[in-house]
Structures are given as C-alpha cells and as structure tokens.
Amino acid sequence: MKKILICILSLLGLTTACGQKGFEETDVKGFAELIAGENVVVLDVRTAAEFDEAHLAGALNIDVKQGDFVEQAKASLPTDKTIAVYCRSGRRSASACEKLAAEGFRVVNLKGGILAWMDAEMPTTAE
C-alpha cells in the first residue's frame, strides 16, 4: 500500500513540475515598469497587419505563427537582455515565451496582451 501511495504522489509531483512555465508573467503595471527600465527589448508577436494598427513604442515585430519564428528571434534578439513579450490577448505571447525560454532567453509575458494594455489607457503608436 505504501508503494502505491508513493507512486501516486510521485506522479502528481511530475505532472505539476511538467506544467510549470519557463517564463514569468506580469500585469500591465508590472510590464510598464519592466519596459521603462534598461536592458529590456519589447517584442510584439502578432501579425504585421496587427502591429501596423497599434503597438508599443519601440517594439520589434516577429510573428509567432511564422514557421521560422525561433530562427528570426535568435537572429534579432539579444540574449543578454530581458525580452518583454506581448500579443493581442496573451495566448500567442505565452506560446512565444515558451519557445524563447527553451532557447535560453529570459522572457516576461504581458497578461491580457495589448488589449489589457489599451484597457488601462497605456500609450500605443501606429508609427
């Protein structure tokens, strides 16, 4: 009976460990504080059309849905800076964060994406 209980608890521990993210997430306030600092690159992982409509000032755009996303990111992003990642609602940026974290980047995801950012009346640009 003890062995069965130990096996069950071990499996629960493994599934919990596998579900952990390899990146941080933050809300709009934390994201704003992060990108105001130095050693941060802001990355918008939406499509080019979405980026052209509105984005955070100074953001780079690499579409996470492109097959060569990781290769583009490795060619464009510094490994010695934090990458602050966002998309429309947070789902694509979470996917991008997983991919980038697996490549050794330090990444932070904006919970709620640019929608949350704009709901908080934070600045965007179309330039």
Label for each model-derived stretch:
Residues 86:
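Short, surface-exposed ligand- or partner-binding patches at beta-edge/loop junctions that are enriched
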Residues 42-44:
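Structural scaffold elements adjacent to functional motifs in cytosolic proteins
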Residues 2-5, 12-40, 49-82, 91-127:
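Rhodanese-like catalytic fold shared by cysteine-dependent sulfurtransferases
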